[in-house]
């Protein structure tokens, strides 16, 4: 490695090129080189290691063995985003316009009204308070790189100039010769030069749950699958190994994933896009009304300055002050509800994103499966038996008295190094922690359940010699004394890979008797092996032999290094196959996803056969759907002759995936409904997510390993596992499944869809009162009547009576089975659309305005000012110097008296809006169903009705409100003037819904169904 290793892209302006380079497959070639070639490349020695001088030189050249921290976003920037992003912009604009209007009034009037100033202050307070609330709800620093740092080993054992030295992991250099043992964390990417029973846990990197053997031999072209490379930050679980460091820091496979994850840019969440669209609509409506009435005011002879104040007033009146807080609280309530169902949401906007999801890319191990190997089948006496792993052995379906089974159930626990961890007697067997690898743990639990105490069995059959499993032999062997006091022979037991069974066995046990292993039995054996292997199960063979006492007498010294005992002509006893079984709730959850129109794609680092078997087991590949390989096998033709379009399902290997063009990838995603990606790298997982997004899908990704973190970050919503998930995956994700169960995602989808529907209802309810709030201002300008509703009372509606009721709609249950409809189309199905605006502003809002004005005109008429007399009276009404304004009865009114009547009208108009909002709240419970069909089961909504009524009564009758908020007591009869309009709203909307149900897809639905 004479020149600086350039396999890792340098930081430069072409950031996109850097990211594209990172998405490519790992550019490691050292696994294909001989040890001598690797030594030459890195200027090192396989025995002596680097010289101290070379190590110092390489440290200067390459820098420390550490991950480069990404630029982090300061907390104040995050706070500002909450304060000035999305919906807040609309309120800030309103506040600035209010201050501007007040400034104009202050500059042109002797005694300017303070309404605009108060409104500006309140709007500012609303934005700041809601911004703080959102910030603290979502407060999370970008700790992705910090969690990667936690995975970095602190110390490493290196050999320099022939001496073993313990150094800080950051000082490990490319070319260093290092030594690792069981329990160590690998300090860099290393090319293994020697190994003794070494196994590493690559699950965080590749997703494989089984520990992988390491040896000096190249076993695969793919560096992630070969046995002679050990990766930075993975764990050595047993054995020892030596190797030459080939990559450090950012150049390691883990470093590439870290840089890829932290460098990914994520787009806006669907709800953020919807809120932006809503702002555009509201701004458009506000500006249109404002400009229209600005022109009208100029035509009517108002001064330019007055017209500007009117323009600002109308724009501000269109701002729904309470809606930002309502949306935030609704999302928070749903997030809390989801947390109770094991879905912890880190980002409030992610609550709705899950409901919009159209594609779920799910990891296999631990998400769809239980993340624990379990014995699934056994083959003995020439029959396949299903294993019984129930605690009470109620599922047993084979003869446990069979002599062959008794022999198999003796070999399996004796030729096994796994053991239960201490102090777990009260824990059920299936849930006990085991010291040992996954396959041996499965065998241990199976035998403990079926036959009783394994420890007792081992005590009775004392082990005297053992050859541990190694990749070369592919078997494990142990020799035991037998429990029969009258038999002094030693029992040799062996288990291992299938390819090593037949050549070591001369006999097979059938019905408890040894018989020759003839061709017929070999064929039966192969058929059983192929059948179990085809189910994606890991198959192990078991055999035994009672060693002749004359050759191996009591006390014989067995030598396991230079084998001095018989290891062939054994008796084959049976097969046992293991699989990481699907979670019980997953098939039902996948079925619900399918009925909800959500495509579930499996993306795993595991073997294609295993992945396909699990996919079929959980319903990702449904019964009857075939892959091209299945079609080829059925028709007995080569795979190349099968048209890929004929196969609804497909299983794609990572090695094939890397050769696909973007168009080919899009073609697969578009034309196959059921897809499994196997043996995928972290970069490929990311490419799959980007491919789905390119086709317009809203993608959810589930994962638990470091290998999943780039895809989790890029997805529209990343879902990490709370129990088995790495810190890195949890930091990259938007949501965490506390129970690691895929079925919880379906619950989340349901909640997400429900909150979208309920937000629509909340917004429709809130926007409706905008019209009775705006129209008094318009009549004030055009007809020149006294103002019917003041700024203060508008604030009491938006931030007082309306808010609790709007939030109560978040508790509304679904109208129909929302998991039976297709996912929301982000282009067509908007949170706020023209139909919602038409209903809220053009229909229900107009009826509400009529109710408010009816109360207004009745009160003024009772006080002597008939409607005909009010037209054009505004200038005299608001003239402070005029204290003898005459009404229709001939009474003279001072300015103060007139204002008391006006403020009483404001209060009556306010109460009228509350009364008509009762009906609006009830009709907003549903968008299509009749309220009678839905019922009044939402107790929070009923409370909301009482709350807004009680608040209105409090504001009307509480002493001191006339001074504080200019609200005056009303006669009890004045509360009833708006009742007919409230009833009219209810009847009108029920009639609309009846037509919707009777004539689906008709004109009424096209124009009014929001």
From Swiss-Prot:
Extracellular side: 96-118, 296-307, 780-789, 854-905, 958-972
Superkingdom to which the source organism belongs: Eukaryota
Molecular function (Gene Ontology), one example: metal ion binding
Annotated catalysed reactions: K(+)(out) + Na(+)(in) + ATP + H2O = K(+)(in) + Na(+)(out) + ADP + phosphate + H(+)
Region entry Interaction with phosphoinositide-3 kinase, spans: 69-71
Keyword Hydrolase attached: no
Keyword terms: ATP-binding, Cell membrane, Ion transport, Magnesium, Membrane, Metal-binding, Nucleotide-binding, Phosphoprotein, Potassium, Potassium transport, Sodium, Sodium transport, Sodium/potassium transport, Translocase, Transmembrane, Transmembrane helix, Transport
SMART domains linked: Cation_ATPase_N (SM00831)
Residues that span the membrane, as ranges: 75-95, 119-139, 276-295, 308-325, 760-779, 790-810, 831-853, 906-925, 939-957, 973-993
Region annotation Disordered: where it falls in the sequence: 1-21, 201-221
Active site annotation, chain numbering: 363 (4-aspartylphosphate intermediate)
Enzyme class: translocase
Localization in the cell: Cell membrane
Presence of the UniProt keyword Phosphoprotein in the record: yes
Cytoplasmic topological segments: 1-74, 140-275, 326-759, 811-830, 926-938, 994-1010
Residues annotated to bind Mg(2+): 704, 708
Main location, first listed in the record: membrane
InterPro entries (alphabetical): ATPase_P-typ_cation-transptr_C, ATPase_P-typ_cation-transptr_N, ATPase_P-typ_cyto_dom_N, ATPase_P-typ_P_site, ATPase_P-typ_TM_dom_sf, ATPase_P-typ_transduc_dom_A_sf, Cation_transp_ATPase_P-type, HAD-like_sf
EC code(s) of this entry: 7.2.2.13
GO cellular component: endoplasmic reticulum; Golgi apparatus; plasma membrane; synapse
Pfam families: Cation_ATPase, Cation_ATPase_C, Cation_ATPase_N, E1-E2_ATPase, Hydrolase
GO biological process: intracellular potassium ion homeostasis; intracellular sodium ion homeostasis; potassium ion import across plasma membrane; proton transmembrane transport; sodium ion export across plasma membrane
Family to which the UniProt record says this protein belongs: Belongs to the cation transport ATPase (P-type) (TC 3.A.3) family. Type IIC subfamily.
SUBUNIT field: The sodium/potassium-transporting ATPase is composed of a catalytic alpha subunit, an auxiliary non-catalytic beta subunit and an additional regulatory subunit.
Cited NCBIfam families: ATPase-IIC_X-K, ATPase_P-type
Annotated protein name in UniProt: Sodium/potassium-transporting ATPase subunit alpha-3
Annotated source species: Oreochromis mossambicus (Mozambique tilapia)
Gene name of the record: atp1a3
């Amino acid at each position: 490695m004479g020149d600086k290793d350039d396999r890792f892209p340098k930081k430069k302006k072409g950031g996109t090129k850097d990211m594209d380079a990172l998405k490519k497959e790992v550019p490691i070639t050292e696994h294909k080189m001989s040890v001598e070639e690797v030594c030459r490349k890195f200027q090192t020695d396989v025995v002596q290691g680097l010289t101290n001088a070379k190590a110092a030189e390489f440290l200067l050249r390459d820098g420390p063995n550490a991950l480069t921290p990404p630029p982090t976003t300061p907390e104040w920037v995050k706070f500002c985003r909450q304060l000035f992003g999305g919906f807040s912009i609309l309120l800030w604009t309103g506040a600035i316009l209010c201050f501007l209007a007040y400034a104009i009034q202050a500059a042109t009037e002797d005694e300017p009204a303070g309404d605009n100033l108060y409104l500006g202050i309140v709007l500012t307070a609303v934005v700041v308070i809601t911004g703080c609330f959102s910030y603290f709800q979502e407060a999370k620093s970008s700790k992705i790189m910090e969690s990667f740092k936690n995975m970095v080993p602190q110390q490493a054992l290196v050999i320099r100039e022939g001496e073993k030295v313990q150094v800080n992991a950051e000082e490990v250099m490319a070319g260093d010769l290092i030594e690792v043992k069981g329990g160590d964390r690998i300090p860099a990417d290393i090319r293994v030069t020697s190994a003794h029973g070494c196994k590493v846990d690559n699950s965080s990197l590749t997703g494989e749950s089984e520990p992988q053997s390491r040896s000096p031999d190249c076993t695969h072209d793919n560096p992630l699958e070969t046995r002679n490379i050990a990766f930075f930050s993975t764990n050595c679980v047993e054995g020892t190994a030596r190797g030459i460091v080939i990559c450090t820091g950012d150049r390691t496979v883990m470093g590439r994933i870290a840089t890829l994850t932290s460098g990914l840019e994520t787009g806006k969440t669907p709800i953020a896009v919807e809120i932006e669209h809503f702002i555009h609509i509201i701004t458009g409506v506000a500006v249109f009304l404002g400009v229209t009435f600005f022109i009208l005011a100029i035509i009517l002879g108002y001064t330019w300055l007055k017209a500007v104040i009117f323009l600002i007033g109308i724009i501000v009146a269109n701002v729904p002050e309470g809606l930002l807080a309502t949306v935030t609280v609704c999302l928070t309530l749903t997030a809390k509800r989801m947390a109770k169902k094991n879905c912890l949401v880190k980002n409030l906007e992610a609550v709705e994103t899950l409901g919009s999801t159209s594609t779920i890319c799910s990891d296999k191990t631990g998400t769809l499966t239980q993340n624990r190997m379990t014995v699934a089948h056994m083959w003995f006496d020439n029959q396949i038996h299903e294993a019984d792993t129930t605690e009470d052995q109620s599922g047993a379906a084979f003869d446990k008295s069979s002599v062959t089974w008794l022999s198999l159930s003796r070999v399996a626990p004796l030729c096994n190094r796994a053991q239960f961890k201490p102090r777990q007697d009260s824990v059920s067997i299936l849930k006990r922690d085991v010291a040992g690898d996954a396959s041996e743990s499965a065998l241990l639990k199976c035998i403990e359940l079926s036959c009783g105490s394994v420890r007792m069995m081992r005590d009775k059959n004392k082990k005297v010699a053992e050859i541990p499993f190694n990749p070369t032999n592919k078997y494990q062997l142990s020799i035991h004394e037998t429990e029969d006091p009258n038999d002094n022979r030693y029992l040799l037991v062996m288990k291992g890979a299938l390819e090593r069974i037949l050549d070591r066995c001369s006999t097979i046990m059938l019905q408890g008797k040894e018989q020759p292993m003839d061709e017929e039995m070999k064929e039966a054996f192969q058929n059983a092996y192929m059948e179990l292997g085809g189910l994606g199960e890991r198959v192990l063979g078991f055999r035994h032999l009672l060693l002749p006492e004359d050759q191996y007498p009591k006390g014989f010294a067995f030598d396991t290094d230079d084998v001095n005992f018989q290891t062939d002509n054994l008796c084959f006893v049976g097969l046992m196959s293991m699989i990481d079984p699907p979670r019980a709730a997953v098939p039902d959850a996948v079925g619900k996803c399918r009925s909800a129109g959500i495509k579930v794609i499996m993306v795993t680092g595991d073997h294609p056969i295993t992945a396909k078997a699990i996919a079929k087991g959980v319903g990702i590949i449904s019964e009857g759907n075939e892959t091209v390989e299945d079609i080829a096998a059925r028709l007995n033709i080569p795979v190349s002759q099968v048209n890929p379009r004929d196969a609804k399902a497909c299983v794609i290997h990572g090695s094939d995936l890397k050769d696909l063009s973007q168009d080919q990838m899009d073609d697969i995603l578009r034309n196959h409904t059921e897809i499994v990606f196997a043996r995928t790298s972290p970069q490929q997982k990311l490419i799959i997510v980007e491919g789905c997004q390119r086709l317009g899908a809203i993608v959810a990704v589930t994962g638990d390993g470091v290998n999943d973190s780039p895809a989790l970050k890029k997805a529209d919503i990343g879902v990490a596992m709370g129990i088995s998930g790495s810190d890195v995956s949890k930091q990259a994700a938007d949501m965490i499944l506390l129970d690691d169960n895929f079925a919880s995602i379906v619950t989340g989808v349901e909640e997400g869809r429900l909150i979208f529907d309920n937000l629509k209802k909340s917004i429709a309810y809130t926007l409706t009162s905008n019209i009775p709030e705006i129209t008094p201002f318009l009549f004030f300008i055009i007809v020149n009547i006294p103002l019917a509703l003041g700024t203060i009372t508008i604030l009491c509606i938006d931030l007082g009576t309306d808010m609790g009721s709007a939030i109560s709609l978040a508790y509304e249950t679904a109208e129909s089975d929302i998991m039976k409809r297709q996912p929301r189309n982000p282009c067509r199905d908007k949170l706020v659309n023209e139909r919602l605006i038409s209903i809220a502003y053009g229909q229900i809002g107009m009826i509400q305005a009529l109710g408010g004005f009816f109360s207004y005109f009745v009160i003024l008429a009772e006080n002597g000012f008939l409607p005909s007399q009010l037209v054009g009276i505004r200038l005299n009404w608001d003239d402070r110097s005029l204290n003898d304004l005459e009404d229709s009865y001939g009474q003279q009114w001072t300015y103060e008296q007139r204002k008391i009547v006006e403020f009483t009208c404001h209060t009556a108009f306010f109460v009228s809006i509350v009364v008509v909002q009762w009906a609006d709240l009830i009709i907003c419970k549903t968008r299509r169903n009749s309220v009678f069909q839905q019922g009044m089961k939402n107790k929070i909504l009923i409370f909301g009705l009482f709350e807004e009524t009680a608040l209105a009564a409090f504001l009307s009758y509480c002493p001191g409100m006339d001074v504080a908020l200019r609200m005056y007591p009303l006669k009890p009869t004045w509360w009833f003037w708006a009742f007919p309009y409230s009833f009219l709203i209810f009847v009108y909307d029920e009639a609309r819904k009846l037509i919707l149900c009777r004539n689906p897809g008709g004109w009424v639905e096209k124009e009014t169904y929001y």
